[in-house]
Amino acid sequence: MKISSLSILPLLGVVSAGIHGKKPNGPTYAGTNPGCTWYLDLVDDSYTCENIESQWDLSHEAFVAWNPGVKKDCSGLKVGLSVCVEAPMESITATPTSEASTSSETSSASPTASRPPLPSPTQDGLVSNCTKFHQAVSGDTCSKIISRYKPITLDQFIEWNPALEKDCSGLWSGYYYCVGIPGTPSAPLTSMPASTAHSGTNSNATVKPAAPGPTQDGIANNCQRWHKAVSGNTCASLLKQYGTFTLEEFIKWNPAVGEDCSGLWLNYYYCIGIPGTPTTKNSVPKPTTTACNTPGLPSPTQPGAICQCSKWHQVRQGETCDSITRNYRISISKFKEWNPNVGKDCYGLWLRYYVCVGGK
C-alpha cells in the first residue's frame, strides 16, 4: 500500500516542502553523480528503489549509477540521506579503466597521463580540475580551512566548492573539499627556512627550486627541472621530447608513476632533471642502436637491441611483449635476449620503435 499511495502523490500535488530540490538537504552517498541536477530527501522508511524509480520515471540502472551507495539490490537505501533523481543521461557510463594491463608481462608501451583519482565523499558541483583536497573535521569552518591553506581566498574556496553557501553553511564533516587547482600557490613549497640554504659544511648549498604546482609523493628531493603533464603525455613521449634522461632515471625521480608509467597524472609536475642531468638533447646519445653498422637497419630501433637481427617489428599502439611474441611465435625469453632494454616487466617497450623479432 505504501508504494501505491506514494506513487499518486505527484497527482494530488501534496509533495512535502523540502522533500526534493536542486540541492540535497542531507548527506549524499559516496560517488553520487557530480552532475546531479535534482535530489530527493529520504525523510521516512516508505521509500524503496521501486517507488522512487516509478515516481521519477527512472531505470534502475540509472538510479544506481547516480547513487552507487544504494547498491543494485537496493540494500543501501537509508532514511536521512538525499538521492539523485535527475542528471544528464550521458553521465550514465561505466567507470573508465586504464588501458595499461594489470599483467606485468602485458604492460603497454605508452600509458597516457590521466586525471588523479577523486577522494570520496564529496558534494556536488566540485570543480573538475581540483588537485588538492581537504577532509572536513568536526569544528572546521571556512575561515579555518582558508587560514590553513593560504593564500587561497574565501571567494576561490566557494567557487571550487559551489555546494557551500556564501556564508559557508553546508560544510559537512567527513566530506572532501577542493583547496587547490592548477596554478594555485602552495605555501609549504616556499616556506623552507632561509637558513637551510647554508646549513652543513657546504657553503655553496642552495635551496632546491620548488615545483611550480602539484606533485606526487616520493619525487626526487634534489630535482632542478620540472615538466607539467598534459593530455597525451606518456613516459616515452617525455623521453623523446627532452632526450636528456633515461626511462629508468625518470621512474627513479618520480616513483609514483610506476614501472609501467600508468600513474602519470594530468596537470601534475614531474622531475626531469637533477644535478648533473644534461640540459640539451645533444648532450646525450640518441636512443638508437648506434653501435650497429648493419646495412638497411630500420630507424629508430629499440635501445640495446642486438645488431645481428634478421627481422624487425615496429611497435604499434596497444602492443605488448606478450602480443608481439605470440604473433611471431617466439619465446618471451628469446625476445628479451634480443631486446634487453625492454626490461624485466616489459615497461621499456617504446611506441613506434623497432624491436628485434628474429636473430641470425
Curated annotation (Swiss-Prot):
The keyword Signal applies. Residues 94-125 are annotated as: Disordered. Keywords: Cell wall, Chitin-binding, Glycoprotein, Repeat, Secreted, Signal, Virulence. Glycans are attached at residues 129, 204. Pfam families: LysM. It is found in: Secreted; Secreted, Cell wall. Residues 94-113 have a biased composition (Low complexity). Residues 37-85, 132-179, 225-272, 311-357 form the LysM domain. The keyword Membrane does not apply. Residues 1-21 form the signal peptide. Induction: Expression is induced during growth on Sabouraud medium containing glucose as carbon source, but not on keratin powder, nor on human nail fragments. It comes from the Eukaryota. One of its GO terms (molecular function) is chitin binding. GO terms for cellular component: extracellular region. The LysM (lysin motif) domains are small globular domains involved in binding chitin in eukaryotes. LysM2 contains 4 LysM domains. Belongs to the secreted LysM effector family. Secreted effector that binds two substrates, chitin and N-linked oligosaccharides associated with human skin glycoproteins. Could provide the pathogen with three important functions including shielding host cell wall chitin from the human immune system, shielding the pathogen's glycoproteins from host degradation and immune surveillance, and helping facilitate pathogen adhesion to human skin. This is Secreted LysM effector LysM2. It comes from Trichophyton rubrum (strain ATCC MYA-4607 / CBS 118892) (Athlete's foot fungus). The lineage of its organism: Eukaryota, Fungi, Dikarya, Ascomycota, Pezizomycotina. The gene is LysM2.
